Each structure stands twice: as structure tokens, then as C-alpha cells.
Amino acid sequence: MSGMYPQPLMMMPQQQRRPRKPRTKSAPKPPTTSKMSEKTKKEVTKSTMSTEKQIPMPTIPAASKGSLKDLDVRNNLNQQELNGIYYDTVNNLNACHGRMIFQPTGGSLTEGTLTVTIKLRVKSDQCLKMCSAFHKRNTNLETPLSAVDISKESEKSLGKD
């Protein structure tokens, strides 16, 4: 019965394995679209990796450059448009679980422009908590934009970068 199984011709010497390199903790990488599902891809491309929205300023004629009234955002956008921009930014924040950074040029939203930067989150519970807390506080669109003091809100919820 020894002819049933072929005998190995020669035992190959086993090669020694190289020791593994010790893993070092590297900085977390931003999400890549190749590993994402289609739904997530759409959300990321829709909100983009870093989205900036700036409330447009009116063009100022040379004759009235000295007048600050022409610089007022409220002369250029009505309340509904302001609420729309605000709603979009909150939605983008919610879609990408990011951080929203407000940069008002004046002391509050009633003065000057407001730049909103949305950044995708690094995996962190603290960041998610901040986002959800911010979102819960600011989803009420009945509150006019000018009544919300964004500069103080951002310091409380986001901390210093």
C-alpha cells in the first residue's frame, strides 16, 4: 500500500522568517474614497474635504467707498438667504461629521462677513460630541442668524486650535 501516495522527493529546508518591524503610531489618515461605499463617497464629494462658504459682499461703487453702509451684509442678502447658507453649513457638518470653524470679520454676524470652514473629522469621540452638541443647539432656523453670537459659540464648542 505504500504506492498510493507519492513520496516527497526532498524535504525543502525552511527559511527563517524576518522579524516584523515594530509598529509606530502614525498620524490618522484622512478617509480615502477608494475604501468607501458609494453612499459615503457621494456624501464626501458633496460636502468636499474642506468646504468654505463665504457670505458674498456687495460690489462697492468707487463713489461710496467711504460709506460703511454699503459693506453691510444685510443690504446684500435677505434673512431667508442667510438662513439658507446657515442651514447648508449645518447640513454639511452633519454629513461629514466635521468641525465647523466660524471666522466673523466683525464682532458678530451683524457686522462684516462670515467665513465658515468645514473640516472632516479625525476619528474621535470628543469631536463627534462637539459636532452633535453644536448641531442640536443650532438647527432651529427660526432663530435669525444675527441673533446667534457665533464667535462665542465656536470658542465654547470647538476650543482653540
Swiss-Prot record:
Residues 1-16 have a biased composition (Low complexity). GO terms for molecular function: RNA binding. It is found in: Virion. Residues 17-26 have a biased composition (Basic residues). Residues 1-52 are annotated as: Disordered. Residues 36-45 have a biased composition (Basic and acidic residues). Keywords: Ribonucleoprotein, RNA-binding, Viral nucleoprotein, Virion. GO terms for cellular component: ribonucleoprotein complex; viral nucleocapsid. Its main location: virion. Belongs to the torovirinae nucleoprotein family. Major structural component of virions that associates with genomic RNA. This is Nucleoprotein.
